[in-house]
Amino acid sequence: MRKIIHVDMDCFFAAVEMRDNPALRDVPIAIGGSRVKRGVISTANYPARKFGVRSAMPTAMALKLCPHLILLPGRFDAYKEASVRIQEIFSRYTSLIEPLSLDEAYLDVTDSLHCHGSATLMAQEIRQTISDELNLTASAGIAPVKFLAKIASDLNKPNGQYVITPDEVPHFLKTLPLSKIPGVGKVSAAKLENLGLRTCEDVQKSDLAMLLKRFGKFGRVLWERSQGIDERSINNERLRKSVGVERTLADDIHDWSDCETIITEQLYPELERRLAKVKPDLLIARQGVKLKFNDFQQTTQEHVWPKLNKDDLIATAKKTWQERRAGRGVRLVGLHVTLLDPQLERQLVLGL
């Protein structure tokens, strides 16, 4: 039996904004386009949700519901950076990671030895680590299959988790509304209700041939989900565009020799290991370094390089240290590579 964790960040874009500007924490905010441009809301914080503001809502409607709503245009570089760090935390527990977007992912921890193999404890640790290292909260669902883990992650939001053990699956499905199954939208739910199908138990009692006749392939998927069947594996190639590793230091460092030691003894070996799991012996697009200073400002430096190269990374880090540190202590050191687009990589490899 598999152990699947679905991690979903809590109002992610808005949470990053509130973290970086605490004055926004208790006021209604939303990330989205302006009313003039007929934009839509990407996400809203919980104070805004109390007024009925929701994701995918037209901005004009959101402002009618909450006239004092603060609209923010979005800082996608900041969201991407936080997402990369979250993925790095996931990778401490398993290499079987399937990102669904910047703020959610599936993890298969079936064979992980962390926390004595307990997926529940791993989910707790992952959420706590995200809170400690990024000052953001996440919710999680734990189940033996993907779709149930995704449903479970929404049952104890925000900043909570819900476990569906294999023994609990039949009871959980008995009263589960079909509208909760990922992929069942409002239109499909209405069609199913017209047939008297509202819960998974209703589908369990129905004829598969009838479902196939009326809904085709979707009918089979619906029947399988209602039985608790979901054989999809983790697709860990999905959206994977970079590999990185970084360390937040217990004490600020001021000497380049300390930084070089961290890179050569800790970061580079770990980066090699992670890259080997994703793209062994294949080309990369760029590699680079990141330094964060004790005033919380940070800088990155990268350039085109076809293969992972320790000497080049050390030289890049030293140049960045000398030119941008300005006497400040360094509290975080990171290395990363940007992966080559698969189609371009294939063209280059075939041309060699």
Swiss-Prot record:
Its annotated compartments are: Cytoplasm
Q: Provide the GO MF annotations for this entry.
A: damaged DNA binding; DNA-directed DNA polymerase activity; magnesium ion binding
Q: Which cofactor does it need?
A: Mg(2+)
EC numbers: 2.7.7.7
Return the cofactor note field.
Binds 2 magnesium ions per subunit.
Residues of the active site are: 104
Q: Cite the position(s) of the site with description Substrate discrimination.
A: 13
Query: What Pfam families is this protein classified in?
Result: IMS, IMS_C, IMS_HHH_1
* An annotated GO cellular component: cytosol
Domain annotation UmuC: ranges = 4-185
Query: Per UniProt, which keywords does this protein have?
Result: Cytoplasm, DNA damage, DNA repair, DNA replication, DNA-binding, DNA-directed DNA polymerase, Magnesium, Metal-binding, Mutator protein, Nucleotidyltransferase, Transferase
Any single biological process term in GO: SOS response
Q: Which InterPro entries match?
A: DNA/RNA_pol_sf, DNA_pol_Y-fam_lit_finger_sf, DNA_pol_Y-fam_little_finger, DNA_polymerase-Y, DNApol_IV, IMS_HHH_1, Rev_trsase/Diguanyl_cyclase, UmuC
Query: What is catalyzed by this enzyme?
Result: DNA(n) + a 2'-deoxyribonucleoside 5'-triphosphate = DNA(n+1) + diphosphate
Renumbered to this chain, the signal peptide range is none
The residues that hold Mg(2+) are: 8, 103
What PROSITE patterns does the record point to? UMUC
> According to its UniProt entry, what is the function of this protein?
Poorly processive, error-prone DNA polymerase involved in untargeted mutagenesis. Copies undamaged DNA at stalled replication forks, which arise in vivo from mismatched or misaligned primer ends. These misaligned primers can be extended by PolIV. Exhibits no 3'-5' exonuclease (proofreading) activity. May be involved in translesional synthesis, in conjunction with the beta clamp from PolIII.
Q: Which NCBIfam families match?
A: PRK02406.1 (NF002677)
Q: How does it assemble?
A: Monomer.
Q: Which family does it belong to?
A: Belongs to the DNA polymerase type-Y family.
Q: What is this protein called?
A: DNA polymerase IV
Species the sequence originates in = Enterobacter sp. (strain 638)
What does the record give as the organism's lineage? Answer: Bacteria, Pseudomonadati, Pseudomonadota, Gammaproteobacteria, Enterobacterales
